[in-house]
Amino acid sequence: MDINQGCCGFVVGLIEAFMLLEQESINKVVLLNADVLSRKVSKRDRNSNPLIGDAATITIVEKSMEPVVIHGLLKMDGTNADALMIPAGGFRLPASDDTRQMIEDEAGNFRSQDNLVMKGDEVFNFVQREVPPMIENLLHVAGSSKERVDWYMFHQPNRFMLHKLADKLGVPREKMPSNIVENFGNASGATIPTNIGFNLGDRLMREQYVFCLAGFGVGLTWGALLLNIGNLSFNEIIYY
């Protein structure tokens, strides 16, 4: 099964994995999240290129012998899809010699229609407007509170956005790590599992924590999960 969901991909992938595990014949799901954004962003795009990275993650999700309750929310709104998209390459505008032509924007960035376009202000405003109330709603539905969450592991476009999200949610910044872009770059749907592996490492092989996971981006799509993660068989970063 191949799901194209960009920066919300890990959350969407986990939701799909949980639904698959509801089937009696399925006991284990291997979830692969990978993106090679460096091939989608123009090298002459000073707005996006410095933040981009490539990564692939593997998450093995197994059926539990004990009842497990996981709360999740997923939302989509296509009215602002052009805030974060690759204009060409689909049926509406197939890739061609014309779409490969580089065009300079008002800020001096050069992109073709085959390159990723990220309207930073619009994406930032969307995240600050939509994500905090989604998290508040998720916690309300789960009968939980912000204080009972140990870690807020969110998709990481940049440190500034994560700091503003933490402040708006009223949670300590140290509970919402924001150091992935500076170490690995923004690798789209792979940033959340990279975040977990890099910041918690083998601690998750010995301990269990309450996590709030959130992804947001292309679509525009945003989603969140509230769940326990811990006592893992492995949790490591492999550099290449």
State where each predicted segment sits.
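Claisen-condensing/thiolase-fold acyl-transfer catalytic domains that form or cleave C-C bonds
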Residues: I3-S25, Q128, P132, D150-Y240
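Short beta-strand segments
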Residues: N4, V29-D35, V61, L73, ...
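Short, well-ordered, mixed-charge alpha-helical segments that flank or form enzyme active sites
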Residues: G9-V12, L37-V41, G78-A81
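Acidic-glycine-rich active-site phosphate/pyrophosphate-binding loop
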Residues: L31-L37, I103-G108, M161-E174
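Condensing-enzyme catalytic core mediating Claisen C-C bond formation in acyl metabolism
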Residues: D45-N125, R129, P133, N228-Y240
